[in-house]
Every structure is written in C-alpha cells, then in structure tokens.
C-alpha cells in the first residue's frame, strides 16, 4: 500500500510539473483528488484493511493528499503569474509611438458670418432680437403692408400649416413684435432662419437672414446709406463701391436694392457677377407709414428705415463659395476649411 501511495504521489508531481495552463492543472486536481480520483479511491479501500493498518494507511493517504494539494496551489500561482505577464505583454502600449491627434471642431461659416454681423451692429448700439419661426399671417404679412393678393402669400412661395400658421418667410415679424412692445426710438437687428419654397444653386428652402430696423424722429435714407457703406467696408475688410437701385417692397417707401462692387473682380466683370461688376446683396428702404400705423406708432412723428440681407449669400461672397447648397450638406471635408 505504501508503494502505491508513493507511486500516485510521483505521478501527480510529474503531471503538475508538465501542466502548462490552468485548465490542465484543474484536470489533474480532479484526477487525483476528485470524488473519483486515485487518492479518493484509496480512502474508500480502507474498509478492507485491518484495524491496525487503517490509521497508518489513512494518515499516509491524507499526507499525500495534502502534499499534492500544496503542489497544485503553488503551480496555480505560477501559471496565473505567467498568464498575467502574457496578457500585459500582449496589451503593452508603446509610449514612444506618435499620438493620435483629435481634430478640433470649428464654427460653421454661416455662424461665423452671423457673429461678425452681430459684433458690428452691437457696437453701434443695436439690440439683437429673435422671434418664433412659426408665425401668423398677421405678423408675417398683414402688419407689413403685404395685401392678400400679393404673390408672396401664395402656397407655392410660403410653407403653410393646416391651422393657418406658417413658417416665416423673413425675420420682419420680429421687428413687428418688437415695435408692439417698445416705444421709439430704438434700433435692432433680427438674425435667424427663414423659409421659402425655392431650391436651386443660389436658393434653399431654408436660409439665414438678418434684418435691421431703426425708428427715430430723425431717421433718413442718407443715414442708412452711410451705415451700409461702413458695414460692408468692415465686413470685407476694404472700401467697396455701393449702388442703390430703385425697387419696390410693400413694407418700405421709398425702396431700394443695394449692389456692391464685385469682390472677385473688383468691379471689372467676371462670372461671379455675370460680367456686370456688381453683386446684389440686400434690399432696404424707409419704413412704410402703414407698417408704423399697424403697431400704433405715429408716422407723422417717427420715421424709420429697414434693411434685409441673406447671411448665406454673404458667406458665399466672403469665403468664395460658388454653390449655396454646399453650406447645408454637412460635408466635413468642406467645412473644415473654415
């Protein structure tokens, strides 16, 4: 019996030495110490021994069992250390490798233009006001002296909702709401999104517009002209020639459209300006008396001027973009240029 116990110990010791992973070592534990293991079978055979042999053999088997368990625990620690070292080696980070730079974001070109416009007018004491994009016909049309038969009120030019509301076609409703709430004199600009049923190279169903308004007893068209000349010199960084052309808008009288000297060819004529040397940039005029009456301002005491221009159009001119739709396609390769 002693020889058998020693043989089992030697077999277990050799098997433990040869084990290369935790799974194999666990199998050795089962083979020698499990319910059907070799040492367990010896313990079951004690019943066949004499009363004198049972204690001695039982003690030897337990000693062998303890010895094998100790060898397994020692080997288990060794294998776990090797496993950890192998994992660390596989996941090792080479700190000498160059880092991966994360590109920083930037403001959209239209947002940058909006900030430039806001900065200029806020320095001159203009308030920057905003209003709802979903409007009523009163604020979008009626209060602005736009009659019911006017083409702008047709379904093919304006986005209407079923309940009579609509998506504003300009930021002029912001001016009406402000004039209702404030007493003159005041000056403001109203930047924001506007919507019209139009889509091509130079038009989109949604675009950005900024409108300016000044109500005062001494408001003149000459003052508006001087302001616009100074603004475009600031915006483009150089003096530009301006041309005022008579025009018609229901909410201003007299009305004018303003062209600036082409920023691409300096007025000599090119494809950008259709070889005219001029670029149309905004509409303006003196506020129509009917608009003042609609908001309970006496047109005999106060006068005003207003202008409106597209911020997307200015962004195209400032950055040399030839297709308006590029501003709305979310192409990061394009937007990262700004």
Swiss-Prot record:
PROSITE patterns to which the protein is assigned, alphabetical: AA_TRNA_LIGASE_II (PS50862)
Binding site for Mg(2+): 253
Keywords: Aminoacyl-tRNA synthetase, ATP-binding, Cytoplasm, Ligase, Magnesium, Metal-binding, Nucleotide-binding, Protein biosynthesis
Cofactor details (free text): Binds 2 magnesium ions per tetramer.
Reaction equations catalysed: tRNA(Phe) + L-phenylalanine + ATP = L-phenylalanyl-tRNA(Phe) + AMP + diphosphate + H(+)
UniProt keyword ATP-binding present: yes
Superkingdom of source: Bacteria
Single GO MF descriptor: ATP binding
Any one GO BP annotation for this protein: phenylalanyl-tRNA aminoacylation
Cofactors named for this entry: Mg(2+)
EC numbers, comma separated: 6.1.1.20
UniProt xrefs under InterPro entries: aa-tRNA-synth_II, aa-tRNA-synth_II/BPL/LPL, Phe-tRNA-synth_IIc_asu, Phe-tRNA_ligase_II_N, Phe_tRNA_ligase_alpha1_bac, Phenylalanyl-tRNA_Synthase, tRNA-bd_arm
GO CC terms in record: cytoplasm
Disulfide partners: none
Location(s) in or outside the cell: Cytoplasm
SUPFAM superfamilies on file: Class II aaRS and biotin synthetases (SSF55681), tRNA-binding arm (SSF46589)
Pfam families xrefs: Phe_tRNA-synt_N (PF02912), tRNA-synt_2d (PF01409)
Subunit-level organization: Tetramer of two alpha and two beta subunits.
NCBIfam families linked to this entry: pheS
Membership in a protein family: Belongs to the class-II aminoacyl-tRNA synthetase family. Phe-tRNA synthetase alpha subunit type 1 subfamily.
The protein's name in its UniProt record: Phenylalanine--tRNA ligase alpha subunit
Organism of this sequence: Legionella pneumophila (strain Corby)
């Amino acid at each position: 019996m002693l020889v058998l116990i020693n043989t089992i110990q030697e077999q277990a010791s050799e098997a433990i030495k040869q084990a290369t992973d935790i799974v194999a070592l666990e199998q050795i534990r089962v083979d020698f110490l499990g319910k059907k293991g070799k040492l367990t079978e010896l313990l079951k055979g004690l019943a066949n021994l004499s009363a004198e042999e049972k204690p001695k053999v039982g003690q030897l088997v337990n000693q062998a069992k303890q010895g094998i368990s100790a060898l397994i625990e020692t080997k288990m620690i060794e294998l776990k250390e090797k496993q950890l070292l192998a994992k660390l080696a596989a996941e090792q980070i080479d700190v000498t490798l160059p880092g991966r730079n994360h590109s920083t974001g930037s403001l959209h070109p239209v947002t940058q233009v909006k900030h430039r416009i806001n900065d200029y007018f806020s320095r001159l004491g203009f308030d920057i006001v905003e209003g709802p994009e979903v409007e009523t016909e009163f604020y979008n049309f009626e209060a602005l002296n736009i009659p019911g038969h006017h083409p702008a009120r047709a379904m093919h030019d304006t986005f209407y909702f079923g309940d009579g509301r609509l998506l504003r076609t300009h930021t002029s409703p912001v001016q009406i709401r402000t004039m209702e709430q404030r007493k003159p004199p005041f000056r403001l600009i109203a930047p924001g999104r506007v919507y019209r049923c139009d889509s091509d190279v130079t038009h989109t169903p949604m675009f950005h517009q900024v409108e300016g308004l000044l109500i005062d007893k001494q408001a003149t068209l000459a003052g508006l002209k001087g302001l616009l000349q100074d603004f475009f010199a600031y915006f483009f960084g150089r003096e530009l020639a301006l041309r005022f052309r008579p025009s018609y808008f229901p909410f201003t009288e007299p009305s004018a459209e303003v062209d600036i000297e082409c920023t691409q060819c300096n007025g000599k004529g090119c494809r950008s300006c259709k070889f005219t040397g001029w670029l149309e940039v905004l509409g303006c005029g003196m506020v129509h008396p009917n608009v003042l009456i609609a908001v309970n301002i006496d047109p005999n005491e106060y006068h005003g001027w207003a202008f409106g221009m597209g911020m997307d159009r200015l962004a195209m001119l400032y950055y040399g973009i030839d297709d308006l739709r590029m501003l709305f396609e979310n192409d990061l390769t394009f937007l990262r240029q700004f």
